[in-house]
């Protein structure tokens, strides 16, 4: 169960980083 939460958080972090990169690399 903890692993599911960790993997979900890591997926969220990856998505946030990708989104931030898109906006900062105009």
Swiss-Prot record:
Superkingdom: Bacteria
Residue numbers carrying N-formylmethionine: 1
Any one GO molecular function term: toxin activity
Major site of localization recorded for this protein: secreted
Gene Ontology BP, a term: symbiont-mediated hemolysis of host erythrocyte
Family annotation (InterPro entries): Delta_lysin
Pfam families reported in the protein's UniProt record: Delta_lysin
Gene Ontology terms: cellular component: extracellular region; host cell plasma membrane; membrane
Compartments it resides in: Secreted; Host cell membrane
Keywords: Cytolysis, Formylation, Hemolysis, Host cell membrane, Host membrane, Membrane, Secreted, Toxin, Transmembrane, Virulence
NCBIfam families (alphabetical): PRK14752.1-4
Function: Lyses erythrocytes and many other mammalian cells.
UniProt record similarity statement: Belongs to the delta-lysin family.
Protein known as: Delta-hemolysin
Source organism: Staphylococcus aureus (strain MSSA476)
Gene that this polypeptide is encoded by: hld
């Amino acid at each position: 169960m903890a692993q599911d939460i960790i993997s979900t958080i890591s997926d969220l972090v990856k998505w946030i980083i990708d989104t931030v990169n898109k906006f900062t690399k105009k």
